[in-house]
Amino acid sequence: RSSAASDVYKRQGETLIASIVALALIVGLVRFVGWRVQVDEAVASQEQLQTQYDFNPGNIISDGLFFNGNALSEQQVNAIIEKQGAACSGEKCLKSMTFSTESQPANEYCEAYEGEPNESAAAIIYKSGKACDISQKVLLTVLQKEQHLLTATDPSDFQFKSAMGLSCPDDANCDPEYAGFFKQVYGAAKRYQYYVQHEDRYGYHAGTLNYIQYNPDASCGGSNVYIENKATALLYIYTPYQPNAAALDAGVGEGDACSTYGNRNFAIIYNSMFGSPRG
């Protein structure tokens, strides 16, 4: 009797385990199907935005166009600065300013940068992009997005000190450690590579759904975005908001009280100078 009872208990235990495993598989499958539905909905919405506004919040710029330290030569960078800044005639024009730069040793993010006493903006942009394998087109775009330095006719000291918006969050003061044109440009290029290698430390990831707000004020809302690549993920780490409908409807203008423009303007500026950021 004891052996028979033991067999019964054993069979009951095996049945219970099998039921638990089956239930876990069903729950996992339901969750996966639900996740796929959310992904499909997000991607469909993103494709609609791309068709309507030429802006895709999940694919702001391709990895191939972002991570390319050979995108432009120093001469090509200089030509763009000269063209964009044609209306500037003051002493502080980006095209005529020079900056003392400090040598930077090679590290896990960038190759070595050799500093010089009087480097042009074009040289700094070219060398920073080359050292850190970040497109010079991207660096030029961010300069214009953050402080309008390419087209400014009378730029202020602050515009140069915070040229790339590096360590200048929307809701706090800028970090003086990164103040200055060279520290901003080289620092931003290096920071981009840091973000890529340490994406797990931040709240935006490629290949999955990410809830992205429209504004620092959470009450303005946001939406799920399926981020398609690393370059787009790091843009959100750098500027953690997406444009709302009012911002997209406004084109290059202003939307409503909940609108933010950083990533919208990145796409618009890049496209105006270099063509589609998605390749």
Residue ranges and their predicted role:
Residues 2-9:
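Short, small-residue-biased leader/transition segments that mark boundaries at the very start
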